Amino acid sequence: MAKLSEKQAELFRGKNWGTVVTLREDGSPHATPVWIDTDGENVLFNTAIGRAKERHLRRDPRVAVTVLPADDQQSGYVSVSGTAEITEEGANDHIDKLAKKYIGQDKYPYLQPGERRVVVTVKPDKVDSMGS
């Protein structure tokens, strides 16, 4: 398993958007902007059951996540390729934490009735970067 450096982890901890790439059933890539986080070892993002990312990852857990610094996109990037693990445990708390980080709200305001959130944990197999 590859490891994030502290500088790379800080980029995921910051108020920077990530791009998640999953694989469609036909093998073509599907890229989506997401709110991101890290536990220092893995990359984390949140989605809802039934969304394309979640369906793709249940079928094929290979995933890539790239982050650029929001304040200086010329300074580099970090891209993590790895394997996704999906859990509902703690997902609502996680999306609330991300809402606080990205939009300054204590509760995620876009939760739909009946929506079930999941945390996706990306275990890095490879870390590529430039400037980080």
Could you tell me what each predicted segment is?
Residues 1-17:
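Extreme N-terminal tail/first-helix region
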